[in-house]
């Protein structure tokens, strides 16, 4: 297990090279966070299709869509697209952590947790909230850009307007994520694919049939923390968020409790002695302050 925990190609770096690689990889991470605003902005357009169809002429056909499909476009499509975008990023951020010279796999997951949480707060909360409010009043926003006081007021007034999007997001995560954890459809399909194509020796076949999956702490904690930030941020502005948050967290609690008892195996190579929880508490305290 100690052998598997080490990232041996990162053990040969001297301290100066490791610091240089760390700075370079964090620079790439921040560039990713900044330029990821483009697809996030496109996602936010779907949540304001009524306003966009009024202001942009060639989108007028959207008004002719029946109410049920239009409700799906405004409510389900943006949150689903955001969840898909979020699922594409962790492998790329994990690669950043690995290339920065982190020597062990558990520390790579800790670094991934930090990077992914920063991304979700900056992109999925701050930028998405601002975009959702700005798109409803573009003229006033551009007029107030040169006046810092009015600009700050525009940003603060944009926060309540994005509440409906985050309500849909919490409902989607609470229902779909918990259902996916209980059903385990994707892991089941992958199990049979691995048995068919990767079980070339009796040893590999035994491991495929008897080894359990381990929880992906580096992505699980940021996703849960992001929902917590939404609940804290809108608990006064939009009190109905409290109900959605309670239902979502209760469903996720049942799903993960079942998984930890019967599905997951916390492997020693990813053991951090509780550092994920400590970092999560620090992040929540910082956001609260």
Give the ranges of each region predicted by the language model.
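Transmembrane transport/permeation module of multi-pass membrane proteins
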Residues: 1-287
């Amino acid at each position: 297990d100690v052998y598997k925990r080490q990232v041996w190609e990162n053990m040969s770096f001297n301290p100066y090279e490791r610091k240089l690689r760390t700075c370079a990889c964090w620079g790439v991470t921040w560039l990713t966070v900044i330029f990821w605003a483009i697809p996030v902005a496109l996602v936010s357009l779907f949540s304001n299709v009524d306003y966009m169809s009024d202001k942009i002429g060639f989108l007028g056909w959207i008004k002719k869509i029946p109410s049920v499909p239009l409700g799906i476009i405004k409510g389900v499509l943006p949150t689903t697209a955001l969840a898909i975008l979020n699922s594409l990023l962790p492998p790329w951020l994990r690669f950043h952590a690995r290339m920065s010279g982190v020597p062990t796999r558990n520390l790579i997951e800790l670094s991934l947790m930090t990077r992914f949480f920063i991304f979700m707060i900056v992109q999925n909360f701050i930028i998405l909230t601002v975009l959702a409010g700005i798109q409803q009043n573009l003229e006033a926003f551009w007029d107030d850009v040169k006046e810092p006081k009015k600009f700050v007021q525009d940003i603060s007034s944009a926060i309540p307007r994005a509440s409906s999007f985050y309500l849909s997001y919490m409902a989607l995560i609470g229902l779909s994520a918990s259902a996916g954890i209980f059903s385990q459809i994707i892991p089941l399909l992958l199990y049979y694919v691995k048995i068919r194509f990767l079980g070339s020796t009796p040893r590999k076949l035994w491991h495929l049939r008897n080894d359990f999956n381990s929880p992906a702490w580096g992505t699980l904690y940021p996703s849960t923390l992001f929902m917590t930030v939404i609940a804290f941020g809108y608990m006064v502005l939009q009190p109905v968020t409290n109900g959605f948050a309670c239902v979502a967290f209760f469903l996720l609690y049942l799903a993960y409790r079942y998984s930890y008892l019967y599905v997951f195996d916390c492997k020693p190579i990813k053991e951090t002695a509780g550092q994920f929880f400590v970092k999560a508490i620090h992040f929540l305290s910082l956001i609260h302050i």
